[in-house]
């Protein structure tokens, strides 16, 4: 009786392995089909969208037309004596520093 039961359990386990293999293949196929549907939907959405370059150009135009709120607007030097610190000397002979 043991020989018969061990033989039938061996066949049963063989069927389980085949079923699990089938199930894995079906699950993988279902996942791939779902991914394909997702990509098709995404492609349809992209086809309906405007070109990015047109949107970027419009955005850049709006940004360029407005001054930066964090930078002060100056029309010229407020105090002309400050310019001496940012400009080089007018004559090389007057310069006493070794850098310039």
Curated annotation (Swiss-Prot):
Q: Which PANTHER family match?
A: GUANINE NUCLEOTIDE-BINDING PROTEIN SUBUNIT GAMMA 1
Instruction: Identify the propeptide residues.
Output: 98-100
- What is reported when this gene is inactivated? Hypersensitive to auxin-mediated induction of lateral roots, within the epidermis and/or cortex, attenuating basipetally transported auxin and graviresponsiveness. Enhanced sensitivity to glucose. Abnormal roots architecture. Enhanced susceptibility to necrotrophic and vascular pathogenic fungi, such as Plectosphaerella cucumerina associated with a disturbed expression of genes involved in cell wall metabolism (e.g. lower xylose content in cell walls).
Q: Where is this region: Regulates lipidation and cell membrane subcellular localization?
A: 90-96
User: Which named protein is this?
Assistant: Guanine nucleotide-binding protein subunit gamma 2
Which GO cellular component does the record give, naming just one?
plasma membrane
A Pfam entry, by short name:
G-gamma
Quaternary organization: G proteins are composed of 3 units, alpha, beta and gamma. GPG1 interacts with the beta subunit GB1. The dimer GB1-GG2 interacts with NDL1, NDL2 and NDL3. Binds to NUDT7.
Cell membrane listed as a keyword: yes
Please give the tissue specificity annotation from the record for this chain.
Mostly expressed in roots (excluded from the stele), seedlings (especially at the hypocotyl/root junction), floral stems, floral buds, flowers and siliques, and, to a lower extent, in leaves (restricted to guard cells). Also present in hydathods.
TM spans (from-to)? none
* Function noted in UniProt: Guanine nucleotide-binding proteins (G proteins) are involved as a modulator or transducer in various transmembrane signaling systems. The beta and gamma chains are required for the GTPase activity, for replacement of GDP by GTP, and for G protein-effector interaction. Involved in the abscisic acid (ABA) and ethylene signaling pathways. Regulates basipetal transport of auxin (IAA) in roots and hypocotyls, and thus modulates root architecture (e.g. lateral root formation).
